From Swiss-Prot:
Pathway the protein contributes to: Carbohydrate metabolism; tricarboxylic acid cycle
Membrane topology: Multi-pass membrane protein
GO biological process: cytochrome complex assembly; tricarboxylic acid cycle
Key words of the record: Cell inner membrane, Cell membrane, Electron transport, Heme, Iron, Membrane, Metal-binding, Transmembrane, Transmembrane helix, Transport, Tricarboxylic acid cycle
Cofactor note: The heme is bound between the two transmembrane subunits.
One term of GO molecular function: electron transfer activity
Positions contributing to a ubiquinone binding: 92
Bilayer-crossing regions: 25-45, 68-89, 100-123
Database matches in Pfam families: Sdh_cyt
Oligomeric form and interacting partners: Part of an enzyme complex containing four subunits: a flavoprotein, an iron-sulfur protein, plus two membrane-anchoring proteins, SdhC and SdhD.
Residue numbers on the Cytoplasmic membrane side: 1-24, 90-99
Species for this entry: Rickettsia typhi (strain ATCC VR-144 / Wilmington)
Name listed for the protein in its UniProt record: Succinate dehydrogenase hydrophobic membrane anchor subunit
Length: 125
């Protein structure tokens, strides 16, 4: 039995997995850098408000700059987690139907969490 290496090489080159993999890799790195920058803001915010009352902290959170940074932090962290969970699911789940279902569930969970967070931020007292 002779194994056809040429057919396998052509098959692997014709699939666009390398392009999507590079894009996925780049997205993970970009979201990681954004999260690192946002974590500096979060650490600064925690240290500057460590002795304040909860009402003062909530008032600080309602400033537009802090709301925007907080929304960016939560959204990017959830998107970063979706990217990571997708890699884990694709690597360890062999059944295609289950794999696709789990990826959709993870994406929906993160979308619902982002929407709930936005509603909680803008509709809090």
């Amino acid at each position: 039995m002779i194994y056809d290496f040429k057919a396998e090489i052509i098959k692997s080159k014709s699939s666009s997995s390398s392009k999507s993999g590079a894009h996925h890799w780049l997205l993970q790195r970009v979201t990681g850098v954004v999260l690192a920058l946002c974590s500096f803001w979060l650490i600064y915010f925690m240290f500057t408000n460590k002795n304040n009352d909860i009402n003062i902290i909530m008032w600080e959170f309602k400033k537009p700059f802090n709301i925007v940074i907080l929304l960016i932090t939560v959204t990017i962290s959830l998107y970063h987690s979706v990217l990571g969970m997708r890699v884990v699911i694709e690597d360890y789940i062999n059944c295609h139907k289950l794999r696709n279902t789990l990826i959709i569930i993870v994406k929906l969970f993160c979308i619902l969490t982002i929407v709930a967070f936005i509603v909680a931020i803008f509709y809090s007292e």
